[in-house]
A protein has these predicted regions:
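A domain-level signal for caspase-like cysteine endopeptidase catalytic cores
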Residues: 7-11
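A short beta-strand-loop structural module common to alpha/beta enzyme folds
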Residues: 29-41
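Short amphipathic alpha-helix with an adjacent loop that forms part of the alpha/beta core around
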Residues: 42-48
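Short, catalytically relevant binding-site loops at active-site mouths
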Residues: 41-42, 60
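FMN-binding flavodoxin-like domain, especially the glycine-rich phosphate-binding loop
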Residues: 2-3, 13-17, 25, 29, ...
């Protein structure tokens, strides 16, 4: 069974709520999905997930929340052999911040693609100016993600 690791970076908890919702939706679809909100690099490496879903908010001036930033830095520094593994990213932001909108998700996406991971689906960007139910807004995208992950097994 394809194992999907769900990593999240949050400031106020919304990204973790979306990540937990994604975990349940992917499990409902028949995938082995695990939300790992504060996993250390070595533990993630030992888990050896076949796919990654990153769910992150953007904080400050386009920054990634600290815990996820530290993990991404370690992943990039150690360059695990994840070439060809499926990657998907959900960004949470607010268009009121202009060009910093979903900047953390864009940075995470680019850094993981540079390791050779395979983009499975266009990044989902959820705008806090337009929604108060990001979990519900993610539903159609999560359904497409589940279909593509099941096909990738």
């Amino acid at each position: 069974m394809l194992e999907v690791a769900i990593l999240s970076g949050t400031v106020y908890g919304t990204a973790e709520e979306v990540a937990r919702h994604a975990e349940q939706r992917l499990r409902d679809a028949g995938l082995e999905a695990r939300h790992l909100p504060r996993i250390e690099f070595e533990a993630l490496l030992a888990l050896d997930p076949q796919a990654l879903l990153v769910v992150t908010a953007t904080t400050g001036a386009g920054e990634t929340p600290d815990a996820l930033q530290d993990l991404l830095d370690e992943i990039v520094a150690n360059q695990p052999d994840w070439r060809g593994r499926p990657l998907a990213v959900i960004g949470l932001g607010d268009t009121a911040y202009g060009e910093d909108f979903c900047a953390a998700a864009l940075q995470a996406h680019m850094r993981l693609l540079a390791l050779g991971m395979r983009d499975l689906l266009s990044q989902l960007q959820l705008d806090a100016s337009e929604t108060v139910t990001p979990e519900e807004d993610a539903e159609p995208w999560l359904a497409r993600l589940a279909e593509r992950l099941l096909a990738a097994r």
